[in-house]
Amino acid sequence: MSDVSPSVLFEHPLNEKMRTWLRMEFLLQQLHGQRALSETAIALTFFRTVADLLDVLERGEVRTELLKELERQQQKLLAWADVPGVDMSLVDQLRNQLKQRGAALMSAPRLGQSLREDRLISLVRQRLSIPGGCCSFDLPTLHMWMHAPQQERDDDVANWQQTLEPLNQALTMVLDLIRQSGQFRNQISLNGFFQDNAEGADLLRLRINLAHQLYPQISGHKTRYAIRFLPLDSELGVVPERLTFELACC
């Protein structure tokens, strides 16, 4: 039996573009985790997630920001060329992958447009804000779709997910590289409080021992951040005077 206590990972964005990317990642992971929409409740969860993602995509220049970041990551990799002992074949491989992700994202139609234009998604999306608004008498189209053969529904879901692949692949690679750019280091909070300089970071990643039953309340931006640890049990929980946790600035 392992004597290593489990930990909980928290991530906090330090700017608006990272906030948007993390939300998109969260929604895309949910969409790709739902394959067989065998029941209406499962299907409605899927359609709500699609609607949420479309709302996020409509708020900003998602494609432009991702393309800029893909280019920035390529430039960062170029800097490794002058470092002795670096595996340049791996660096070149990553740069080629970044170029491919960028080209696919650039050539893709307007992000989410095919989902917006899909008749079933559009009908369901219009009714989601109404409590109980997706009943069979409100949405007979959805009711009929749920009675179609499972394979037909699976094919529809796969086609919808496929339209998001240029976004999903670019976003996944960008976030992977950003997360890998920061190493976890042990830190100590005093009386539940910790603050430091962000040094131009985009993302804070924080690991806390689950046994403490604490969660972080983080505020910050690209130059400075502050963390306050709060007990999950607001009445009986205790925050140690000195708390060791792991922190990575990415």
Swiss-Prot record:
It holds the Pfam family ZapD. Keywords: Cell cycle, Cell division, Cytoplasm, Septation. It is found in: Cytoplasm. Disulfide bonds: none annotated. The keyword Membrane does not apply. It comes from the Bacteria. The keyword Cell division applies. GO terms for biological process: division septum assembly; FtsZ-dependent cytokinesis. GO terms for cellular component: cell division site; cytoplasm. PANTHER family: CELL DIVISION PROTEIN ZAPD. Belongs to the ZapD family. Interacts with FtsZ. HAMAP family: ZapD (MF_01092). Cell division factor that enhances FtsZ-ring assembly. Directly interacts with FtsZ and promotes bundling of FtsZ protofilaments, with a reduction in FtsZ GTPase activity. This is Cell division protein ZapD. It comes from Serratia proteamaculans (strain 568).
